[in-house]
Regions:
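A glycine-rich phosphate-binding loop feature that marks nucleotide/adenosyl-phosphate handling sites
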Residues: 48-49, 188, 206, 227-231, ...
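Short glycine-rich or small-residue beta-strand-to-loop segments that form or flank ligand, phosphate
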Residues: 12-19, 169-171, 260-263, 310-313, ...
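Gly-rich Lys/Arg/Thr-decorated short loops/hinges at beta-loop-alpha junctions or inter-strand turns
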Residues: 50, 149-151, 219-234, 252-259, ...
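Peripheral docking tails and interdomain loops at the edges
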Residues: 20, 143-146, 152-157, 171-174, ...
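Active-site cofactor/cluster-binding pocket
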Residues: 1-256, 554
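Flexible, low-complexity linker and terminal segments
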Residues: 239-248, 256, 386, 391-614
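Conserved thiamine diphosphate
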Residues: 78, 133-136, 140, 144, ...
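Thiamine diphosphate
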Residues: 11-100, 247, 252, 260, ...
Length: 614
């Protein structure tokens, strides 16, 4: 079908929104995956309600999926949307504040009933006027009715037919943005064809019906194209942060030549890592779904003692429960990676929302002097790299490492260039195969201060580990004051020495200027976009973004000294800023903090930076 009034855009933000059962996550995923296959840069933001099943039709039960796709790499899912697809009035109301001026709004006309409007908290029967959308491009197709009409010959009951209405909405968006239907068709055939081919065919018919509706209605004045992004040559796929983390851990095990063991307890939003690792039996991965968080980490510690690359995964509440056993891993000096996918807290908090509020817990949340290496990933795709790095540091330095991600990058997705494992270095743990002359001494150390890793069952390498303090050489239990002081200092020095084994800190932008923006972890995309926009306006603003938290990389002091002002931006109340004050006391740190369960927006960051430059 030939299209007229086609406009080319650099980037577009679409949000699909509806009840939890409306299939918005699948709709957004199919649209974003299709865009990725067309070569667009993409960044996504799945947004789930915190309740398992909030009351249907209420604002509390709204589920959303935001897609930012463009003709260049997209670093974040966008602040405000160009297009909102709302399956009911509650979705319209919940997302009103996220609309760009003049945005296109598509809402299912069948859902605009007195009952639905009352559930959503509207005071009138005209949601468009009540929300001030008269100047917006509002399209109100009867999506549910047209889906029923399109599928009336399938033989499916009404409940099954109505479940396909999200695919009708997807078809509309495919037409508007010149997306082919082929990938979505293939996905549906793969998912349903064997077990329920009628459902697969019904969903395909719904996509086609939505596409044809959009093509034949006069309510869409324009259609749009978005050119592919220039990408480095290679093989790409879309990946979310949890899956990338699992694969990075598998890669670390492969490069170390050791089996991977994961002992974990399911917890939102980290469970997908355990599920993905459980699929990798072909790579020799062993997983245990333990009865609780404590059992999960303790099985991992036992696996590390037995010669495995050991991992446990969790979120903030689970990290609290693992704290005593994490101290045991520090005392035994066994390699262990703890992946903490941060969520809103404290306590149960906001299980499906993002936050960066576990940093202080990761740094200090254990009894005694108990330092660990702390690493943080910045995007869905680089979760692979930093999971690999966490494994490398844990095994080569014989210490636990906490890898911090968060709900935003764990569930979000973006294109990922699949690396060649030849580009990754071999991981060389200090494994002891034979007893040295004079006998094996478990706490004799190498140049990194790492002790030898001797596996059970080898003659002459018998030794004990445990939570009681050990002699600094022989490893037997010791309560000697001088020995305890030495071991405390040595464990701290070992973690500090890891700074020699990580990249020096870098700056995005000029090496000196009026304002240095400091961030860490999953906020990088928003911070970098804000800094780039200000630099384009002639402002002397740069970004120092941290992935290695403890120890801090070399070069930080020299970088900070070259800027007039420093502002730390975090999705917490200033935990990294306080950590910097502790370690680099000569600098003054401004703060911009947010604890709303949402990522930063570029707009609010720029407003803060502008105020600091006045």
């Amino acid at each position: 079908m030939e299209k007229t009034n086609v406009r080319e855009l650099q980037d577009v933000v679409i949000r699909f929104s509806g009840d939890s059962g409306d299939g918005m996550q699948l709709t957004g995923t199919l649209f974003s995956d299709t865009s990725a296959l067309l070569g667009n840069g993409i960044s996504t933001f799945p947004d789930y309600p915190a309740e398992i099943r909030a009351p249907q039709g209420t604002v509390a039960g709204v589920s959303g999926f935001q897609v930012h796709f463009g003709s260049h790499r997209e670093l974040n899912p966008g602040d405000y949307c160009d297009v909102l697809v709302a399956m009911n009035p509650a979705a319209l109301k919940a997302n009103r504040k996220w609309l760009k001026q003049g945005a296109t709004v598509i809402i299912d006309g069948d859902s605009i009933t007195e009952e639905h409007l009352k559930k959503a908290g509207f005071a009138t029967l005209d949601p468009i006027a009540e929300l001030g959308l008269d100047e917006y491009n509002v399209v109100i197709p009867d999506i549910t009715s047209m889906t029923r009409e399109a599928l009336k010959q399938t033989g499916l009951d009404n409940k099954a037919v109505v479940k396909c209405k999200n695919m009708f909405a997807l078809g509309i968006c495919f037409y508007l943005f010149d997306r082919p239907e082929a990938y979505a068709y293939k996905y549906l055939e793969t998912k349903f064809a064997r077990k329920n081919p009628v459902v697969a065919e019904a969903n395909k018919l719904a996509i086609d019906a939505g596409y044809n509706y959009a093509a034949n209605t006069h309510q869409f004045a324009n259609t749009y194209t978005v050119s592919p992004a220039p990408l480095e040559k290679g093989t790409y796929r879309t990946v979310n942060g949890n899956v990338a983390t699992a694969w990075g851990l598998c890669a670390a095990a492969e490069k170390a030549g050791l089996p991977l063991f994961c002992g974990s307890y399911p917890i939102t939003p980290a469970t997908v890592i355990l599920e993905e690792l459980a699929k990798r039996k072909d790579l020799g991965v062993k997983t245990v779904q333990a009865e609780d968080e404590i059992a999960g980490i303790c099985t991992a510690i036992g696996a590390a003692f037995a010669g495995n690359f050991a991992v446990t995964t969790t979120s903030g509440p689970g990290l609290s429960l693992k704290s005593e056993a994490l101290g045991l891993a520090v005392m035994t000096e066994l390699p262990l990676v703890v992946v903490d996918v941060q969520r809103g807290g404290p306590s149960t908090g906001l299980p499906t929302k993002t936050e960066q509020s576990d940093l202080s817990q990761a740094l200090y949340g254990r009894n005694g002097e108990c330092p660990v290496i702390v690493v943080a990933a910045s995007s869905p795709s680089d979760c692979f790299h930093y999971a690999f790095e966490a494994g490398r540091l844990a095994m080569e330095h014989m210490t636990p490492v906490i890898l911090l991600t968060d709900g935003f990058i764990a569930n979000g997705s973006e294109p990922w260039r699949i690396p060649s494992m030849k580009d990754y270095p071999a991981i060389q743990p200090p494994i002891v195969d034979d007893a040295p002359e004079g006998g094996f001494m478990p706490y004799v150390r190498d140049e990194k201060l790492a002790r030898g890793w001797a596996f059970p069952g080898k003659v002459g390498l018998e030794h004990r580990v445990g939570g009681l303090e050990k002699d600094c050489v022989k490893g037997c239990i010791s309560h000697d004051p001088a020995n305890h002081q030495k071991m405390v200092s040595t464990r701290a020095a070992k973690v500090a020495k890891a700074a020699d084994d990580i990249p020096a800190q870098t700056v995005w932008g000029d090496p000196e200027g009026d304002l240095l923006v400091v961030g860490w972890g999953g906020t990088r995309g928003h911070l970098q976009n804000a800094v780039d926009q200000m630099r384009a306006e002639g402002k002397r603003v740069s970004l120092a973004h941290f992935n290695y938290i403890n120890p801090l990389p070399h070069g930080v002091r020299d970088i900070f000294a070259k800027f007039r002002r420093i502002v730390g931006c975090e999705l917490n109340e200033g935990q990294f800023a306080n950590y910097l004050r502790q370690n680099l006391q000569e600098f003054r740190y401004e703060q911009y903090n947010k604890c709303e369960g949402l990522p930063f927006t570029v707009v609010e960051l720029k407003e803060k930076f502008e105020s600091l430059l006045k």
